[in-house]
């Protein structure tokens, strides 16, 4: 700003040092030295240029000079007009022209100068030029050092940026400066832009150098990603790199695109490792047995899709038989997965676990097939895990107790008698069983019409058998009047023939089946029950024979059989006879008085043989 130094005349006539800030039509904006006065506009007639710095100082007595002095301590020093009165060595006695003639002062030679011969400035004393500054260069142009060479080239007194007008101001005392500014302005702005770019690169390089020096002593990892996987590693719009840079402790991530090398720098090993997990994409394969490929894929790819979703891999493909890019084992198909190392590890765990599960299931299936094959070879029924199976020897029905357990009075000799009696059964018994199995009554399972003899019915109901048991002396023919059809009470009352032997035979058959109870409700839809709520095989046999005799025998034979039937029923419920499917009824104390004799048993056997030829077997299954 020395080139734009001016002297401004004060109100006391002294000239004070100032600096031109702007040029106007008829005034100048002046800033005073040390800001002893505020910035203000000064008319041209109060401003003059300072004398040349190389002026010769030849002062003698009587010459007019200017003294650098001040009127008081509050004002700065200025140039005051004075006259030399006396000289003595380096000291001069001066007399101020603006003051009283009697006011003299002794000053040194350095404070004196010849009178300034410059006149006050005019409109054409200073020239101002403006250059519009682009937006990207405004910040750079605010620094006056950026215009140092330009100022020297155009011969300007001052160049500065005006933020309000966004223009570059060029002030000069020469008219030639205006022409040079018009010629060099574009070049100057272009050079500023180039300098800015170079300076920015230098600053970035400097920062990178400092950062590299710091990172050299920190944690870092370097790895290479395949070129075809580089897009996955970078992510959409660099999302993966941004995510890795956000990891706490990561200071820098560098990528060499030519070699596909990532370099990660961080404050700790964990931070660097975590950032690497976001960027390191690999391709790996897993061998799957050929016979399990379909099950690994699943219906509509459901299984493999679930594995992909849970593991986090990006994609999966199955290598075809005509592809030989990967090593292939016999009987194996490679599954190729692409993803981060963590996701590849996850998919290996999931797939290996699923394959192990499928192999175990296949092994269990083969064991089942071998068991079925062995069952077929030994002629047994094919294994079935459902339906009615064999009952064990300790099985007990929910409707009564096992007769062998509830009647401990039976001796081993009676068992032998039963086994011998069972051997007497002939073809007629097998035929009756065949007819029973071929026909069933439609009455419903285990229910009689009266409702007192079916499963779940009252134990003390008024059935035909219970009435006979309660009153053995009553008329047995009353049973016919109390029956509702030929398929109810008469069926139970017809047990007069072979009831004892048939019960023993049925017991013999059950003994072959581990002496288990037989639930009559599962064998017939219209089975009747005894007073204990259970059905015996003898019930079915006697019922079928009684029905056939009632339809085919004469009236006299029928009446005779009914008399004997009542007697046999009473004997059959005696304590000496073991119940087949449960304990005896509540009236067993009265019935236990009636004992069957060997003679009566023989008579019943003969009567059955006499009537068996005339009877038509009408059993039901």
From Swiss-Prot:
GO BP term, pick one: negative regulation of long-term synaptic potentiation
Chain ranges of the KH domain = 222-251, 285-314
Keyword Ribonucleoprotein: yes or no?
A: no
Where is the PTM N-acetylalanine found along the chain? Answer: 2
Chain intervals with Acidic residues compositional bias:
483-493
Q: What is its main location?
A: cytoplasm
Q: Where is the composition biased (Basic residues)?
A: 499-509
Q: Which residues carry this modification: Omega-N-methylarginine?
A: 447, 453, 455
- In this chain, the stretch annotated as Disordered covers 381-530, 545-621
Glycyl lysine isopeptide (Lys-Gly) (interchain with G-Cter in SUMO2), cross-linked positions: 56
Renumbered to this chain, the Polar residues biased-composition regions fall at 394-410
Q: Which GO molecular function entries does the Swiss-Prot or TrEMBL record give?
A: molecular condensate scaffold activity; mRNA 3'-UTR AU-rich region binding; mRNA 3'-UTR binding; mRNA binding; protein heterodimerization activity; protein homodimerization activity; RNA strand annealing activity; translation regulator activity
Top-level taxon in the UniProt lineage: Eukaryota
> Region CC2 domain: what ranges?
353-379
Question: Which residues are annotated as modified residue Asymmetric dimethylarginine in the UniProt record?
Answer: 447, 453, 455
Q: Which residue range or ranges hold the Agenet-like domain?
A: 4-50, 63-115
Composition bias type Gly residues, residue spans: 445-460
Chain segments carrying region CC1 domain: 201-208
Record's subcellular location? Cytoplasm, Cytoplasmic ribonucleoprotein granule; Cytoplasm, Stress granule; Cytoplasm; Cell projection, Dendrite
Quote the Pfam families the UniProt record gives: Agenet, FXMRP1_C_core, FXR_C1, FXR_C3, KH_1, KH_9, Tudor_FRX1
How is this chain modified after translation?
A: Phosphorylation at Ser-420 by PAK1 promotes its relocalization to stress granules and activity. Phosphorylated by MAPK1/ERK2, promoting subsequent phosphorylation by GSK3B. Phosphorylated by GSK3B, promoting ubiquitination and degradation by the proteasome.
Its job: mRNA-binding protein that acts as a regulator of mRNAs translation and/or stability, and which is required for various processes, such as neurogenesis, muscle development and spermatogenesis. Specifically binds to AU-rich elements (AREs) in the 3'-UTR of target mRNAs. Promotes formation of some phase-separated membraneless compartment by undergoing liquid-liquid phase separation upon binding to AREs-containing mRNAs, leading to assemble mRNAs into cytoplasmic ribonucleoprotein granules that concentrate mRNAs with associated regulatory factors.
Entry protein name: RNA-binding protein FXR1
Native species = Bos taurus
Which gene name does the record give? FXR1
